[in-house]
């Protein structure tokens, strides 16, 4: 299962979090966010990382040109679109950056939003479902209605986000079977400053789950 830790701002934390077990790191490319980092800061953070770690930039309502330039300047391997981007826009990003994973984040508060998510699947590589908040795009600490997602079976891989923590991750995964999970505020001391003890605890919980599955419990 993919494990993405989002909102990285410190290069030394990116290396530590990857070594703890993260398969993907997320970098916020939205200037209004308290977790915002520049292309240069992203490059400093991703340069020492192993090649197999996905480096994903999070954008919201940016232009194709801005996204393209940031990817080229920073060394990102993925682009997460977290604003009001249309399926057609997602397709344009994928065409302009064919070697880069395109993720579309959708803030879900009803079954209608889930139906909308299906429309995106043929234009992107991966879906990300986040909790709805009227003012904030992500990192809100709010959880999704997991029960609503139990029958969600998109045709592309999907990540579960929204208020996940080391304390509730096993409960979430007992109800749902996403291809990956995405955590931000649930493993932070403050925005952009990750709590490495919480990250370590997250992976302890995930490893205990894998052990139980492997032992048939």
From Swiss-Prot:
Pathway: Amino-acid biosynthesis; L-tryptophan biosynthesis; L-tryptophan from chorismate: step 3/5. Keywords: Amino-acid biosynthesis, Aromatic amino acid biosynthesis, Isomerase, Tryptophan biosynthesis. GO terms for molecular function: phosphoribosylanthranilate isomerase activity. One of its GO terms (biological process) is L-tryptophan biosynthetic process. Its EC number is 5.3.1.24. The keyword Lipoprotein does not apply. InterPro entries: Aldolase_TIM, PRAI_dom, RibuloseP-bd_barrel, TrpF_fam. It catalyses: N-(5-phospho-beta-D-ribosyl)anthranilate = 1-(2-carboxyphenylamino)-1-deoxy-D-ribulose 5-phosphate. It comes from the Bacteria. Belongs to the TrpF family. This is N-(5'-phosphoribosyl)anthranilate isomerase. It comes from Nostoc sp. (strain PCC 7120 / SAG 25.82 / UTEX 2576). The gene is trpF.
């Amino acid at each position: 299962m993919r494990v993405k830790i989002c909102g990285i701002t410190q290069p030394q934390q990116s290396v530590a979090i990857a070594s703890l077990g993260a398969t993907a790191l997320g970098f916020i490319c939205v200037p209004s966010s308290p977790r915002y980092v520049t292309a240069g800061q992203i490059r400093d953070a991703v340069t020492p990382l192993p090649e197999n770690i996905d480096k994903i930039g999070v954008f919201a309502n940016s232009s194709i040109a801005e996204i393209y330039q940031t990817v080229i300047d920073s060394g990102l391997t993925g682009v997460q679109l977290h604003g009001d981007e249309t399926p057609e826009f997602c397709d344009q990003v994928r065409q302009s950056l064919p070697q880069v994973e395109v993720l579309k984040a959708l803030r879900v508060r009803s079954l209608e939003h889930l139906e909308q998510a299906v429309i995106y699947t043929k234009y992107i590589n991966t879906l990300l479902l986040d909790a709805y908040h009227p003012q904030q795009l992500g990192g809100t600490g709010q959880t999704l209605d997991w029960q609503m997602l139990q029958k969600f079976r998109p045709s592309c891989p999907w990540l579960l986000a929204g208020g996940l923590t080391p304390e509730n991750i096993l409960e979430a995964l007992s109800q749902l079977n996403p291809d990956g999970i995405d955590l931000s505020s649930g493993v932070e001391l403050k925005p952009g400053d990750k709590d490495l003890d919480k990250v370590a605890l997250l992976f302890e919980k995930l490893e205990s789950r894998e052990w139980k599955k492997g032992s048939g419990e």
